[in-house]
Amino acid sequence: MAEAKTHWLGAVLSLIPLIFLLSEAEAASFQRNQLLQKEPDLRLENVQRFPSPEMIRALEYIEKLRQQAHKEESSPDYNPYQGVSVPLQQKENGDLPESSRDSLSEDEWMKIIAEALRQAENEPQSAPKENKPYTLNSEKNFPMDMPDDYETQQWAERKLKHMRFPPMYEENSRDNPFKRTNEIVEEQYTPQNLATLESVFQELGKLTGPNSQKRERADEEQKLYTDDEDDIYKANNIAYEDVVGGEDWNPVEEKIESQTQEEVRDSKENADKTEQINDEMKRSGQLGLQDEDLRKESKDQLSDDVSKVITYLKRLVNAAGSGRSQNGQTGERAIRLFEKPLDPQSIYQLIEISRNLQIPPEDLIDMLKTGEKPVEPEQELEIPVEPEDISEVDLDHPDLFQNKMLSKNGYPKAPGHAVAEALSEGLSVEDILNLLGMESAANPKPPYFPNQYNREKVLSRLPYGPGRSKANQLPKAVWMPDVENRQMAYENLNDKDQELGEYLARMLVKYPEIMNANPAKRVPSQGSTEDDRQDENQIEQALKEHLSQHSSQETDKLASVSKRLPVGTPKSDDTPNRPYLDEDLLVKVLEYLNQEKAEKGREHIAKRAMENM
């Protein structure tokens, strides 16, 4: 019993230090846990220091390595397995079955811990004899600035007896980290290596020598050239500044480039200017052509007017001369003319002639009365006329078909040489001007127009006006779309004009004795003149009554026309044939008007035929 008690007490006493150790370990682990919460980098280290089977096996493995290191003399201060990491050892320990780990009881654990403590107490005694051991975490033993490119050269003397690890882990082994890289390199160089290095450097120097010399020479020449250019540029710049006055001096190349650019710009500008000038010339040429056309048209119109008046006067004079010798023929011709209704266009054309030529009606009548000089008619070219378009009056008088050169506006046009021939036969320019009512420049006669309203009305009704250009006329597309429109424009008259013409025709038919060629009435006597005056007054009164509905201007116009048309014999009986002159002249006027109408019709037909072609 005593032995059992002593044995029990010994066990209790042995457990007391173990309990103290465990309590201290728990306290330390508690502190370590607090530190780990603050510094999470220390967790891996703390996991390895917990009392676990892996840790105990690691301690045993370390002891075995120490024993092997003490026995070997070749490498007393270096452990070749210091580079092995802890996970590798854990892997080796992990290969053990779990049953062997769990099979250890508490008593066995106590024995293992006791042995470890004893070994730890024995270590300080052997520590001065040995160098400091390297722990498993070899990274802490290496300095921070140590490079990782140490050569892993295996020396022949270093042959380990116990190689537990496979060859793949030999790469982790390295030379002594405390040995400098320079020392390792110095050990590798030999005299042979140095000799080869010297020869290599010599060869390299020979190869690179000429190229480097050439480069140096080229660099030197370039520097000299640039220096010379800078000096020249500076000198030229100074001289140029002295001459010009502080302006920058450009090199020759830049000056040439600038000159070429300026020349190109100047050429472009000149080309643009020439184009603009050409355009302006074209425009001005077109305007000039238009002005020339207008001038030509005005001249043509003036020449048409002059030639028309001259030919008209010559025809009247010729007709008057032939009328004296053939009174019977003219009387019969007048009877045949006035038996038919008078064309209303003839009367208005007479008025239009007087207004167009700016000749007062009384002067025109005087010209018709006094045209006594016989003038031979001009022999001009004849234009073929279709017989269907010839009126009865034209057929009765074929001698009137001395067709003139038609003008643009439908009136006979005499060429310039015809005017000279007419003047050479006894007429002068002053005579023609006096006949036309246009005196010399020294004594100008104002043109006759009763009022502006009648002038505008007559000019608006005329097919053309004096001085009217093509630009003012209607275009062909408007007034000549086809044959019918042209014919309507040619034949269309005002309603008032038609009424007036019809009334005059009825009056002439109603009173044929006024213009009747009765020889009994043609005997000059005082009683006949009084009867003629009474008839004239009756006609004027009838006209006024009929035209009372019209405007006063038209009434005055018709009254003036009726007054100026000779009805009876004139007062002056200078010659015995004088009473018959007015009637003959009126017949000539009507014949001329009919001839103009026929010529207009022929011109219209010719134009229509040309357009149809």
UniProtKB/Swiss-Prot annotation:
Modified-residue entries (Phosphoserine), positions: S173, S267, S428, S528, S551, S552
InterPro entries reported in the protein's UniProt record: Chromogranin_CS, Granin, ScgII
Keywords: Calcium, Cleavage on pair of basic residues, Phosphoprotein, Secreted, Signal, Sulfation
Gene Ontology CC annotation, any one: secretory granule
Misc. remarks from the entry: Binds calcium with a low-affinity.
PROSITE patterns linked: GRANINS_1 (PS00422)
Biological process annotations from GO: angiogenesis; eosinophil chemotaxis; induction of positive chemotaxis; intracellular signal transduction; MAPK cascade; negative regulation of endothelial cell apoptotic process; negative regulation of extrinsic apoptotic signaling pathway; positive chemotaxis
Record's subcellular location: Secreted
One of the Pfam families matching this protein, by short name: Granin
Gene from which this protein is expressed: SCG2
A GO molecular-function annotation: chemoattractant activity
Record protein name field: Secretogranin-2
Signal peptide: 1-27
Domain of life: Eukaryota
Region described as Disordered: spans on this chain: 67-105, 119-146, 257-287, 546-580
Family the UniProt entry places it in: Belongs to the chromogranin/secretogranin protein family.
Subunit structure: Interacts with Secretogranin III/SCG3.
